[in-house]
């Protein structure tokens, strides 16, 4: 749909006769990648901004059947927030976030906060800088990727999707500890 809208805008404006800018072409390419994004496979890596990592994360969130546990430092990407809020209607969603995210709320975080998702603030001396998502205690995503528009569209970021049970179990133990110690 975004690809179609972008093309219609190009054709309906007076600029259709001019050569589209590099930025317009990049946005069209990224939109088409997002449309074609499939849920991540086991042991898959995604590198932003060259790949549709935000769309891949949305697809990953949409695969949850029972529970999603998220530890995230920052969130400004509305599409990711919408996927979390939508998932929270049908599966248990728990989030541990950095205290700055709670203070500096924005539209994306507000969407999740208004949903049935349970959110707690990480308790630690410094910042809660983790970035990982656990799905159904069986699969996970981790890496440098924050839930931000910049992470998916301009920053050099990485995501790693895993289902190795021993690794997922370690992250689940870590999340459960963070959850118990976090502030409501």
Regions found by a protein language model. Give the residues of each.
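Structural recognition of the beta-strand scaffold that forms the well-ordered cores
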Residues: 44, 69-72, 94-98, 120-121, ...
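Solvent-exposed loop/turn segments at secondary-structure junctions
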Residues: 74-78, 99-103, 125-127, 139-140, ...
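N-terminal low-complexity, Pro/Thr/Ser-rich intrinsically disordered segments
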Residues: 21-50
């Amino acid at each position: 749909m975004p690809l179609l809208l972008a093309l219609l805008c190009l054709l309906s404006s007076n600029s259709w006769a001019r050569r589209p800018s590099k930025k317009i072409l990049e946005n069209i390419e990224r939109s088409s990648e997002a449309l074609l994004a499939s849920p991540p496979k086991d042991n898959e890596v995604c590198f932003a901004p060259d790949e549709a990592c935000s769309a891949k994360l949305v697809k990953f969130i949409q695969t949850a059947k029972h529970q999603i546990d998220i530890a995230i430092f920052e969130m400004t990407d509305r599409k990711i927030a919408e996927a979390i809020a939508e998932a929270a209607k049908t599966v248990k969603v728990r989030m541990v976030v950095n205290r700055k995210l709670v203070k500096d709320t924005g539209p994306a975080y507000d969407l999740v906060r208004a949903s049935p998702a349970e959110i707690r603030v990480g308790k630690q001396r410094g910042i809660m800088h983790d970035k990982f998502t656990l799905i159904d205690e069986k699969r996970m995503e981790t890496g440098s990727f924050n839930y931000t528009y910049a992470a998916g569209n301009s920053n050099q970021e990485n995501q790693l999707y895993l289902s190795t049970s021993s690794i997922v179990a370690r992250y689940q133990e870590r999340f459960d500890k963070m959850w118990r110690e976090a502030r409501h």
